[in-house]
Amino acid sequence: MSRIGKQPVPVPAGVDVTIEGQNVSVKGPKGTLSLAVAEPIVVARDDEGAIVVTRPNDERRNRSLHGLSRTLVANLVEGVTQGYTTKMEIYGVGYRVALKGSNLEFALGYSHPVVIEPPEGITFAVETPTKFSVSGIDKQKVGQISAIIRRLRRPDPYKGKGVRYEGEQIRRKVGKTGK
């Protein structure tokens, strides 16, 4: 039995969960999210009001989908109650970020500024010219836009310049030794 999949997902007060067949919809103080659960997996409510995810049998595919489905449903509940935030930072001389309206404008050593528009449900916040955060209720969207931003200028293994997640350790390489 999946150790993650068998745990019920607690539903906090103020969160409304609707289950219609394979579709799970969660409405909370921060917004509404929905998920289409894979076919053999069954999602239901138990007596205490928690969400329970079960599988019909122990086939390999069903076992792998069991824990995944439970985690995705738990992410919906956490997203509409607390939301998700990814903090990022920029290293490098002349590298900086600014908020223009709702867009992020990066100066990353290219001949032009790079502008990133937030997708629906995502907000940007700039704390300093080298630190910013990506926030939203959908964990997948927050992670995806953070990865797209990081890809604009990946951290350099020799000098460490680039966009990175806060606290991310970059493997540094030793440069060539001079004669």
Curated annotation (Swiss-Prot):
GO cellular component: cytosolic large ribosomal subunit
UniProt keyword annotation of Cell membrane present: no
Alphabetically ordered keywords of this record: Ribonucleoprotein, Ribosomal protein, RNA-binding, rRNA-binding
GO MF annotations, alphabetized: rRNA binding; structural constituent of ribosome
GO biological process, one term: cytoplasmic translation
Signal sequence, start to end: none
Sequence similarity: Belongs to the universal ribosomal protein uL6 family.
Assembly mode: Part of the 50S ribosomal subunit.
Function description: This protein binds to the 23S rRNA, and is important in its secondary structure. It is located near the subunit interface in the base of the L7/L12 stalk, and near the tRNA binding site of the peptidyltransferase center.
UniProt-recorded name of the protein: Large ribosomal subunit protein uL6
Upper classification of the organism: Bacteria, Bacillati, Actinomycetota, Actinomycetes, Mycobacteriales
